[in-house]
């Protein structure tokens, strides 16, 4: 029973929709036919009735002329003016019309720049600021060299040039820059003593170079060696054979230093309580100085030591 009721309801709905669709189709068809009739009347020759209808339609379609004239006048009033401007003057004309400040700046005289005062530095920066540097002036090297070279070396140079030895002046070391006067009082005794040692070593090195320029074969002999030979008793000379005479090349070099005492080497100076005299380079280079451990160079001529002469 339910199935038969549902089928009957569906069939009635389908029939209703079919009738509504057919009704819509008929109305659409009628409307289409009416439009075709209207168009066919326009294509056909106009009759009196059709001419009156067409004139009425034209009058309704055309706008009235007065409002059109008013609109044209309003358009002419709102149109901007047209300028014929040269391309070179375009910028100036635009600036004049727009009233830009760039044009006013060009025409107006230039204003002087305003210098703002610099902000003052704080007192803390002034307190932390270091003192200004002291300008250090180096002393001329000529004065320093004259002070370091002893006076006796000038006389020796004159005597040796007469004999025929040409000595080249030794190149001095570069002097240290002096300390600024501000820190002169703060110098420690250790630094002053080190400076004294440095100056003494420099003087000894310069004298050693000057003495070594005489003859590279013969060593230096101290005057104390000659004094011991002169003061020795004749019995000692008779008991021991006399030493061999040195070659003639060393005779010239030995006679010259007798007038000037040889400077003591650094570290070889004798103490006041020591019974021994000053040590000379000939003692260091003698063959009997085996305890010192210095080797004898083959180019030097060996000389007897005072110990050998005394025994």
Swiss-Prot record:
- Give a yes or no for keyword Nucleus in this entry: yes
- Name the phenotypic consequences of knocking out this gene: No visible phenotype under normal growth conditions, but mutant plants show enhanced resistance to salt stress.
Q: Which UniProt keywords apply?
A: Nucleus, Stress response
Inducers of expression: By salt stress.
Q: Does Nucleus show up as a keyword for this record?
A: yes
Q: Where is the composition biased (Pro residues)?
A: 240-249
Location of the region described as Disordered in the Swiss-Prot/TrEMBL record = 1-78, 103-125, 228-266, 290-311
| Summary of the tissues where the protein is detected | Highly expressed in roots and at lower levels in rosette leaves, cauline leaves, stems, flowers and siliques.
Short motif (VQ): ranges: 90-99
Q: InterPro entries from the xrefs?
A: VQ, VQ_5/9/14
> Where does it sit, as one GO cellular component term?
nucleus
Q: Name one Pfam family in it.
A: VQ
Which compartments is it annotated to reside in? Nucleus
UniProt biased composition (Low complexity) = 1-27, 290-302
According to its UniProt entry, the protein's GO biological process terms are:
intracellular potassium ion homeostasis; intracellular sodium ion homeostasis; negative regulation of DNA-binding transcription factor activity; negative regulation of response to salt stress
What is this protein's function? Functions as a negative regulator of salt stress response. Functions as a repressor of WRKY8 transcription factor by decreasing the DNA-binding activity of WRKY8 and acts antagonistically with WRKY8 to regulate sodium and potassium homeostasis under salt stress.
Subunit structure comment from the entry:
Interacts (via N-terminus) with WRKY8.
Q: What is the name of this protein?
A: VQ motif-containing protein 9
Task: Give the source species.
Answer: Arabidopsis thaliana
What gene is this protein a product of?
A: VQ9
